[in-house]
Amino acid sequence: MEAIKGSEVNVPDAVIAWLLDGHGGVKPLQDDAVIDKDHPCWLHLNYANPESAQWLTETPLLPNLVRDALAGESLRPRVTRMGDGTLITLRCINGSTDERPDQLVAMRLYIDERLIVSTRQRKVLALDDIIHDLNEGSGPADVGGWLVDACDALTDHASEFIEELHDKIIDLEDNLLEEIVPPRGVLALLRKQLIVMRRYMSPQRDVFSRLASERFSWMTDDHRRRMQDIADRLGRGLDEIDACIARTAVMADEISQTMQESLSRRSYTMSLMAMVFLPSTFLTGLFGVNLGGIPGGGWHLGFSVFCVALVLLIGGVTWWLHRSKWL
């Protein structure tokens, strides 16, 4: 493939415009730079920026379909070969376990042996690892190494997020053993996070597997082996997600049963209290009718005797309930 001049890809509002030096480091992209297989360019754009959007629309370096895809709507992870280049859509984790990952951060890539064009709207935190390594001189030396490192960083962030969700599930299970019911919405949010992760990480694993099996000219056998390891690692994460989803279903049943048992205990307690005080309520109501005068109303000990009788009656009913094993 022919070399590219630096001026053709030097976008003023680019997030990153670097030239890989082939030794794990980078240098700023200059207009007179020569971009080729040995010194590829990484151009990282925010397609919401005006000049970046204009470059994506007008540059002849990208196929027409690629231009639309790099600045288009979010899609599920996929990989598509287009001539000498490859279009890749990936998803990454940015937030914490307390946020709703309804839409994971999308990152779109177009890669050939000379050029890496990555686009996003929200910041991709996983790329910070690659940026740090490149600044330290220990980053990828070529296009294939860059892609493997990027996929590895994305998978690391996904694995950490899955591990955090797993720890939260363990805490909820421990609380349920002590009959501590989580606040309303906590379990629903957890299930939502797991389902969204499952939705996007499953096709992303397939993308990694395909990248490992495709014979791209800019990927070595070592790159393919590492990519397959990444796919296998993400596959184990998906197995963990499936197990967590099943455990949340069990917890939902357990919470429902716990709430039902709590309601039943309260209803049972109220019923017993009604049984204990029902005879005394009947007597006080009967005496209070007062149609022919209250019995014992003229006796100075009448009220005291009546109170003692009520206490004995309540005690007798309580003893009977206890003997009948209702208490």
UniProtKB/Swiss-Prot annotation:
This is Zinc transport protein ZntB. Zinc transporter. Acts as a Zn(2+):proton symporter, which likely mediates zinc ion uptake. The chain crosses the membrane at residues 274-294, 301-321. InterPro entries: CorA_cytoplasmic_dom (IPR045861), CorA_TM1_TM2 (IPR045863), MgTranspt_CorA/ZnTranspt_ZntB (IPR002523), Zn_transp_ZntB (IPR023714). One of its GO terms (cellular component) is plasma membrane. It catalyses: Zn(2+)(out) + H(+)(out) = Zn(2+)(in) + H(+)(in). Keywords: Cell inner membrane, Cell membrane, Ion transport, Membrane, Transmembrane, Transmembrane helix, Transport, Zinc. Gene3D superfamilies: CorA soluble domain-like, Magnesium transport protein CorA, transmembrane region. It is a multi-pass membrane protein. It comes from Cronobacter sakazakii (strain ATCC BAA-894) (Enterobacter sakazakii). It is found in: Cell inner membrane. The keyword Glycosyltransferase does not apply. Residues 1-273, 322-327 are cytoplasmic. It comes from the Bacteria. SUPFAM superfamilies: CorA soluble domain-like, Magnesium transport protein CorA, transmembrane region. Residues 295-300 are periplasmic. One of its GO terms (molecular function) is magnesium ion binding. Belongs to the CorA metal ion transporter (MIT) (TC 1.A.35) family.
